[in-house]
A protein has these predicted regions:
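Low-complexity, Gly/Ser/Thr/Pro-rich intrinsically disordered linker/tail segments
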Residues: 238, 242-258
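A structural signal for short, hydrophobic/glycine-enriched beta-strand patches
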Residues: 2-36, 41-50, 58-240
Length: 258
């Protein structure tokens, strides 16, 4: 496919400029009919615009080009649609050391200090850790400020709050939710984790669950400081899932640019 045209299509789609993006993809599909990435993008973004007929059309063409990628796209779309609408369990049944409590990082200030929002995530993780005392905690986040990564700051805070240092596992290189999901999934596999509970800002939960599930994790619920007063998380309409869709294309390895 023509690189300039492909890159232009991607730039439009990630910003939600669908008419421009779809027109560019349609032209690419004609000029480079064997490019499975183009068909995958058409399928993903047709789903993001709730165009079921186009999802079926582009999905069928993708399957003819790459059954493996088609399977991955179909699974990712199913995950997106479920994560966008499911009732999130804030008091999941954990499985001791096989369930990890995962805290997603958030940008530090210039001196390496945590924001109140990140501290709130950590407080919910501590509450979950008290309810599941055998579960390890994974902190994930890079983005260093003054030589301190998000994971460093979170680990230090947890230890100061009385969490045993050997209970905490650190992933200190991720710079996005996509990387949080990919790198934490890999770390969890290394330490024998079978499922996880996510600790993040409520408004970020649906996207985070989608990313982690697409990356291969089994997310069984979310952390909260009070299981009797959980956040109200309305479902996301089909056309409100752009961020989840963009993330899914990255996790599947569909190039952002050619």
């Amino acid at each position: 496919a023509d690189a300039e045209q492909y890159n232009g299509a991607q730039d439009a789609l990630v910003k939600g400029r669908y008419d421009t993006g779809f027109a560019a993809l349609d032209a690419l599909a004609t000029a480079a009919a064997d490019d499975a990435n183009v068909a995958a993008l058409q399928t993903f973004y047709a789903n993001a615009t709730a165009d079921a007929a186009a999802v079926a059309e582009h999905g069928a063409r993708l399957r003819g080009l790459s059954p493996t990628l088609a399977d991955a796209v179909d699974r990712a779309i199913a995950v997106i649609d479920e994560a966008a609408t499911e009732t999130i369990d804030f008091a999941p049944n954990t499985d001791g050391p096989r369930t990890a409590i995962v805290v997603l990082g958030l940008g530090l200030d210039g001196d390496g200090n945590m924001t109140p929002e990140l501290v709130a995530r950590l407080r919910s993780a501590v509450a979950a850790a008290e309810r599941s005392p055998e579960s390890p905690i994974i902190v994930t986040g890079g983005n260093p400020q003054s030589g301190i990564t998000e994971a460093d700051a979170m680990q230090r805070w947890l230890v100061e709050e009385g969490i045993a240092a050997d209970r905490i596992h650190s992933e200190s290189t991720a710079n996005s939710t996509v990387q949080n999901a990919q790198r934490t999934t890999a770390l969890a596999a290394e330490i024998g984790i079978e499922n996880m509970v996510l600790a993040t800002t409520p408004s970020h939960l649906r996207r985070a669950i989608s990313d982690f599930e697409i990356a291969g994790s089994d997310v069984i619920g979310a952390a909260t400081t009070n299981v009797d007063d959980v956040p109200d998380l309305p479902a996301l309409a089909p056309t409100a899932r752009l961020g989840m869709t963009v993330d899914a294309t990255k996790i599947l390895g569909i190039p952002r640019t050619y």
